Amino acid sequence: MPREDRATWKSNYFLKIIQLLDDYPKCFIVGADNVGSKQMQQIRMSLRGKAVVLMGKNTMMRKAIRGHLENNPALEKLLPHIRGNVGFVFTKEDLTEIRDMLLANKVPAAARAGAIAPCEVTVPAQNTGLGPEKTSFFQALGITTKISRGTIEILSDVQLIKTGDKVGASEATLLNMLNISPFSFGLIIQQVFDNGSIYNPEVLDITEETLHSRFLEGVRNVASVCLQIGYPTVASVPHSIINGYKRVLALSVETDYTFPLAEKVKAFLADPSAFVAAAPVAAATTAAPAAAAAAPAKVEAKEESEESDEDMGFGLFD
């Protein structure tokens, strides 16, 4: 009977993962190291209605996917990434939104001796509140301290652990004494599968503004190269026309050859003061009609005011 139950469970698991792969066009491959059952339950509850979390043995997941390759060959891209303690998060929602929800469900964790540090750990300068008898402990870790009012004070920030280092017993003890929980554990996105394409989760950080700026940077680079080698393209032609016009204008200024636009430049170079004097005159000419138009309006307003006073029976000498 137990064998039948096990076989039935396996069959149901295969059907479930195949159904999820068919129903959901997008999923994350997530690492679940150091994630406990209680935290996993909280993650499932927070994603309810938006995503489905599926964990299982790697061999079973690979077997289920291989058996479904005839119907969906794109799933073969998932196989190389199913290694270690991993699972799937299936969704139809925006991937960035689900990623943010997974990050929000990380929980702080204390450092344990022998664990691999997922991030860098720095102990800030502070008064530890520990007694002088612990001084030798800090000295063994190479941390500069002094005694201040009967307690140990760390004088400067200290990088205690680097990313990927194994946490030593002394480092773990120190962090626990200082009540520092340097790590946070949760489901870590390792790969993104989206409608048959698989890519790094860093792609989710690319915004429309990033794409726009990268595109403009590429256009500028293309225009620069084309200008240097004299090869006309859509990006470089406007600059080529402007540069050509500047050269023709410079040639016209230095020679007797002229054309309408060059005549204005020549006139300016011949007598710049004329253009300086013309600017205030032009401004005054523009302002005069406006003032003239405003004056009749004020007179009309005054006449209307006087007429209204007479109509109301409040003349000046009544």
From Swiss-Prot:
One of its GO terms (molecular function) is structural constituent of ribosome. There is a cross-link at residue 298 (Glycyl lysine isopeptide (Lys-Gly) (interchain with G-Cter in SUMO1)). The modification Phosphothreonine is found at residue 59. It is found in: Nucleus; Cytoplasm. Coiled coil: none annotated. Keywords: Cytoplasm, Isopeptide bond, Nucleus, Phosphoprotein, Ribonucleoprotein, Ribosomal protein, Ubl conjugation. The modification Phosphoserine is found at residues 305, 308. InterPro entries: Ribosomal_protein_uL10 (IPR050323), Ribosomal_uL10 (IPR001790), Ribosomal_uL10-like_insert (IPR040637), Ribosomal_uL10-like_insert_sf (IPR043164), Ribosomal_uL10-like_sf (IPR043141), uL10_eukaryotes (IPR030670). Residues 303-312 have a biased composition (Acidic residues). The modification Phosphotyrosine is found at residue 24. One of its GO terms (biological process) is ribosome biogenesis. The keyword Ribonucleoprotein applies. Ubiquitinated at Lys-264 by RNF14 and RNF25 in response to ribosome collisions (ribosome stalling). There is a cross-link at residue 298 (Glycyl lysine isopeptide (Lys-Gly) (interchain with G-Cter in SUMO2)). One of its GO terms (cellular component) is postsynaptic density. There is a cross-link at residue 264 (Glycyl lysine isopeptide (Lys-Gly) (interchain with G-Cter in ubiquitin)). Pfam families: Ribosomal_60s, Ribosomal_L10, RL10P_insert. Residues 298-318 are annotated as: Disordered. P0 forms a pentameric complex by interaction with dimers of P1 and P2. Identified in a IGF2BP1-dependent mRNP granule complex containing untranslated mRNAs. Interacts with APEX1. Interacts with FMR1. Ribosomal protein P0 is the functional equivalent of E.coli protein L10. Belongs to the universal ribosomal protein uL10 family. This is Large ribosomal subunit protein uL10.
